[in-house]
Amino acid sequence: MFTPRHSFALVVTSIFVMPLAAQTGPGGVGNSTTNVLWLGADHGVFSDAGLTPAVSGANAWQWNDRSGNGSNAMQAMAAQRPNYISGALNGKPVLRFTAANTDRMLATGIPSANRASVWVVARYSSLPSPNPGLLQGAATGDAYSATPALKNMGMWVSSATTQVWGRGIQTDGTSRNVTMATALATATPYVLNTMYRQSAISQYVNHGPAGSVASNGTLRSWTDMAIGAQAGTENWNGDIAEVIAFNVDVNEAQRLIITSYLAAKYGMTLTASTDVYREDQPARGNYDHEVAGIGRINSGNLHTDARGTGIVRISNPTGLGNNEFMIWGHDNGVLGAWGVGDVPSGVEGRFQRTWRVSERNGSGTSSVDVGAVDIAFDLTGLGPVDPAHLRLLVDSDNDGSFSDETGVEGAYLVSGALYRFDAVTLISDGIRFTLGTTDLGATPLPVELVSFTAEPTSDAQVRLDWVTATEVDNDRFIVEHSPDMEHWSSVASVDAVGNSTTLISYSVMDPAPFAGLNYYRLRQVDVNGMEELFPVRTVTIEQDGRDRLLFQPNPSSGLVKVQALVDPFATHLVSLFDGMGRCVHTRSMTGSELMAGTLDLTKVPPGAYLMHIECDGQRRTGRLQLLTE
């Protein structure tokens, strides 16, 4: 089965018995019981109702909740959908909201409670209304309400002062407005956080205090959450990259870990007194990805078991003292062993991906030692693994190389596909680590798709190439094409090698793309019938008007006008071929008949077709999509 280059299948059961259960929420804090909403623009943004991944510039219809609660944010009205923009913030995508279009999204069915912890990563381009809204939480059906008494929680920015503020409404109906304290600059991203605690509602900007108000800890229902709007018409004008909500007030150690995860991911610097993770800095290698951590402020504010969205789980620190943290992230290297030569003697391969650790005090000013820790790797999707072959590789001298190290043995299967090394003492501030194997045959490393590209050729065709690093029980690939990201058809089905541990290249041609924008995606099918879709690629084909065909409309319900330069007096053979290459319609017409009339294809089944028009040994080809009437 295939895993794309920059992701890894994670299948672990989360049980809420804090802190003993795996913490798979943002930064490795919480799980679906407490982390009740989690929207990241790098995960699950669709241009339709959850089927077609959005491409840059496309409108976002659905934004999937990755908390596990299924509270997906949606916008059914096409005119009010924000744009998905790739690579906009530290290489990560954002949703771009336009206030003039009243762009907004709505998440419903959130398991709310009387306490809450909320984060938003955002920036504004302008503040066109008195208080443009980032979030508005309310009871079912009230998330877009302009009635102040129904806005049970929220976060917005004053256009008069550019300061962030918000509110919470208690169950007795008392509205508690957070005082304004911190101004936000135009076009500058921030990590914004509101804590709804037992005795106060407090806001933070990049972890620094940004206003507070007394409260009795009885926040009213916020089962619905408006994103990008408040008060119905006060819309956000700018980018939102991530939204996180907990139905508890997380402790101070957890709050710092979550904020550190967001700051590293989006390339922001926290206030100097709280920058506990340094490995995201360019000079230290940009270990920005899937950051998670453990830490302790005091005995009532600690977090000792974390995993987050990555495959690494660290727990059970033996010497974690007050005001101490261990935070880690990775370099986004491939989860595969091909082409990696930096291994110690006796190790046959290692992950290209490496992790790096910060062990710092709570103010980020000095190194600390949290003691020995347990380090586990979830190898779901790897296939058979013999734990005796696994080696934890630690760059203990911090010289950037693993070849001069000795791998740590002793891995054992905990459950499922989770393999753990207990009481590891080699990890310290700034140290890198990764996972290796002494037998690539018996314990391989994961399957990955290395690349998938689509490029136009000089003769207005499209060449599609993809490369795999390894394959396990792979049956075939299907290349699919669409003119509109809604109607997809097969360009080609290609038999796969099946099982391989070397680089394998594949290539097909699309002989008849549309003039203009074309969308392509790759579908992989296992021998057991399981399928996986890989990200969409786009190609623009210029229309020269001579040797290609255009159809109006396209897609069509069956009545089609052909646009092409043809000899009006010559006889032309018009043929329509389905995806299997079978001719389903043919007739002879003069050029004048062809250009003046309408082809009636209403009796042809819906699907993707190639039309050939031949005359005097010359052939013109075009792609036509027929829809059900």
Q: For the regions a protein language model found, what residue spans apply to each?
A:
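Extracellular glycan-interaction patches encoded by glycine-rich segments
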Residues: Q23, V213, R220-V250
